């Protein structure tokens, strides 16, 4: 049976694969996403490019250690009126982000990369425009 190496420590991404009966093994890439994002922002990269590059970087880095397996890397960013919002580090940050998004249209960009032997096999991204409901 095919096993996917998940270049992530995300419990949500692992659960999605598990729910679809996809054998997987999480192996986080341990890249410093903030450093990569800041570098790409300085180069005026779009949110789509930032998400795609992070997904590729994660998958390619981990795949060097698992030459016989497919490695899945993924990344999501939120664009709120030109400001990139990263995933929260804790519950308080999550609440602050939700307050910031409250009642405002924002963009969710998610990218997925499949890599083998340190080289990209496939990459795709999805761009969704989402309204955030006004809190009562």
Regions found by a protein language model. Give the residues of each.
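Short acidic-glycine loop/turn motifs at beta-strand connectors
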Residues: 80-82, 115-119
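Residue-level signal for inorganic ion chemistry
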Residues: 17, 55, 75, 94, ...
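Active-site-adjacent loop/tail segments of enzyme domains
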Residues: 76-106
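Short, structured loop/turn "capping" segments at alpha-beta junctions
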Residues: 104-109, 118-123
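Conserved small/polar residues in nucleotide/adenosyl-binding loops
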Residues: 126-132
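Glycine-rich phosphate-binding loop
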Residues: 70-76
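N-terminal polybasic phosphate/anion-binding patch
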Residues: 1-70, 83-84
